[in-house]
Design a protein with these regions (language model features):
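Cys/His-rich microdomains that often coordinate metals
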Residues: 1, 6-9, 24-31
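Surface-exposed, charge/polar-rich loops and edge strands
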Residues: 74-75
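Hydrophobic alpha-helical positions that pack around
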Residues: 66, 80, 84
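Nudix hydrolase/Nudix homology domain
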Residues: 1, 10, 58-63, 125-170
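Active-site-adjacent beta-strand/loop module that shapes the phosphate/pyrophosphate-binding cleft
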Residues: 101-126
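N-terminal strand-loop-strand
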Residues: 18-64, 69-70, 91-92, 96, ...
Length: 170
């Protein structure tokens, strides 16, 4: 329903928007709200990658990089630092932009970063992040081959970030 007049809405612009059906209100075009989110590949001084398992993931083998929504009044780099601290207790130094990916559900835009850890002692929150660990390229490859870890899906920016660190496609 139209948030201005309450009339029904119909898909518009090939599904990227909605159009109000109220002609008296000008059949206004409505665009979805986009929720900004950050996703961060965190590396330490030994070029190990921090991977974590989220409590919401059904596959216990799935590990990915840090991610979370940007809060009101927060810049993207601060969101990366806050999420890393909240989820793993890791303090970040330099944070560098890598790219972005639309994430349709829940209407999010994922902005990807690579960050360098200042601290390496992992302390997961136990609520959102259940486990987290540092891995070398050889350790990660061995975990994947043994089936003890699973990588994020092929169409995700998380997988691209891991492959960029790994130096090859999975």
């Amino acid at each position: 329903f139209c948030p201005t007049c309450g009339a029904a809405v119909r898909p518009a612009l090939a599904g990227w928007a909605q159009r109000c059906t109220n002609e008296a209100d000008g059949n206004r075009v409505l665009f979805p709200r986009v929720e900004p989110a950050v996703i961060t590949a965190i590396v330490d001084g030994h070029d190990r990658l921090l991977l974590q398992h989220n409590a919401a993931w059904k596959d216990s083998r799935l590990y990915s990089v840090s991610a979370g929504f940007v809060e009101a009044g927060e810049n993207l780099e601060h969101a990366c630092r806050r999420e890393a601290m909240e989820e793993t207790g890791i303090k970040l130094g330099e944070v560098r932009y890598l790219g972005s990916q639309p994430w349709p559900f829940p209407a999010s835009l994922m902005m990807a970063f690579k960050a360098h850890a200042i601290t390496t002692d992992v302390r997961v929150d136990g609520e959102e992040t259940m486990t987290a660990r540092w891995v070398t390229r050889d350790e990660y490859t061995a975990e994947l081959i043994a089936g003890r870890m699973a990588a994020p899906g092929r169409a995700t920016i998380a997988r691209y970030m891991i492959e960029e660190w790994l130096g090859r496609e999975l």
